[in-house]
Amino acid sequence: DTIERARQLDAFYIRDKYGEYASKHPRFFTNMDGSFAVGDPVSLCAAGDCLDVDIMAGNTVDEFRSFIPAADDKELSAKAEGIFGEKAEKFLALPGARESDGHGRYASVSGIEVTAKAMFSRLKEHFPDKRYYYYRFNPDIPGEDNPGSFHSCELWFMFETLAKCSRPYVGRHYDLARQMCNYWCNFIKTGDPNGRDADGSQMPLWEEYTDGSHSGMTFVSEGSVPEGSDGELVAFLTEHVKNKI
């Protein structure tokens, strides 16, 4: 019950106790304290029990992948039937559904992308006048470790603080960071990320996400690239999640 006593605890005791806690309390989930966080954010948004505001959400491409673990195609089919029921065959016929990464992970997509888009669709039902913007972050991230587009690496870009990072960023990264910071600042000020770049030129149009357009923005090494639709697999899974939340 004191810092002094905590410092006296054996490291292996702390490790084992943390292991017990983590087995019952999944990490990277909402810690609901009943005061500030009174429920699961996705469920609250799906029910319209949230603030009536414009929202921007997105993800880095390589983080939090969702997939179906299976040893082979037969097990994949059985699991698909358990998850999707009568729509299993439709799922299995989609491009990418039967593709494995070589480690028994099939139909890999970004879980955050699918959840965010499903949440946007639900929110639009409750707040039709509000705008919802989706982004996908996937530039090259330099370094000897070849890290990919890892969790929160977009923060250096959106805050335009690349120089404070030890990774060897170069000109194209700074150009992307400038654009992203502009988009974020515009959204914070007006609820709309669109506007002009530092040289006065119009930045690529970032359209809001709707059930009809599925629009968003992909940030790559060459800059900001508007996207106009989802792939069939993402669209199917988004609709599935929408009906579950």
For each predicted feature, which ranges?
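A non-catalytic, amphipathic alpha-helix used as a structural packing/dimerization or gating element
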Residues: 51, 86, 114, 178-183
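Mobile gating loops/cap/lid regions near enzyme active sites that modulate substrate access
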Residues: 117, 121-245
